[in-house]
Amino acid sequence: MLKLGSLELGALPRIAVPFSDRAGRGEVQALRRRGLDVAELRVDRFADPAPARVLAQLDKFTGLPTIATIRIRAEGGGWIRGEAERLALFHALAPRVAALDVELAAGEIRAEVVAAAHQASGLAIVSHHDFGGTPEPGELADVVGRGLEAGADVVKIATAVRDPADVRALASAALAHGGANLILIGMGEAGVATRLLFAALGSLLTYASAGEATAPGQLLFDEMLALMRRLFPAYDAAKAADLDHLDPV
């Protein structure tokens, strides 16, 4: 079973929330105390991504497994600087976080980011985003295969969903792989249900918002948490037990 830091992935669905540098420690820790599972550090949304400033932000996430993401503009992120600078940030972050998320399309730096994650005993998430639509099942299977060949521990696929056929295409990817090593998300209003449905099909993480959505169709964290606890009894029981023994960092 995969572990994100000390958190097991796969047995239960998990909720991740993306944060920029605007989030305060109090806000992050309040979400942790309410049941947040995973924090995603969106370095591409930082006002100043200087390495020292980025690393200083990590203290906010004490007690939470953290994914470091530096998303390029072409895949919905805010990173417009050079790849050498992005790679240097990934190397600086690797020993301090539980996982690095890099795009399948990242080209030359992808292999180095994957290696940096593994050298630091973390997970490598290789991601693919399509804001234009959802590919056919065969194309999705190809993305999964290429991600795993690239050394991914987890392949993340997020596509724009327009109709039920798109939902079925994404669901087919989950069913074909038993959900193992996958994060699948249907973006947009038509894809909101996938953020819950795919957890039942084995998708390892679903993403929610603390107020500033980073993708179309993201639900607010408290709304997502309530739905997950209502729809997944095992998650509800585990969450109740976790909160009873929460370390008050």
Predicted regions and their residues:
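Short, well-ordered coil/turn segments that N-cap beta-strands
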Residues: 11-15, 35-37, 62-66, 96-98, ...
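Catalytic alpha/beta core domains of metabolic enzymes, predominantly
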Residues: 105-249
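Short, acidic/polar
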Residues: 19-34, 81-92, 136-146
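Acidic (Asp/Glu)-rich catalytic clusters
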Residues: 28-35, 50-66, 88-95, 111-121, ...
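N-terminal small/glycine-rich loop or linker at the start of catalytic domains
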Residues: 1-19, 70-77, 116-130
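N-terminal amphipathic alpha-helix/helix-capping segment at the start of soluble metabolic enzymes
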Residues: 1-26, 233-249
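Catalytic beta/alpha-barrel core
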Residues: 18, 38-48, 69, 79, ...
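Active-site cofactor/substrate anionic-group-binding motifs, chiefly glycine-
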Residues: 64-71, 214
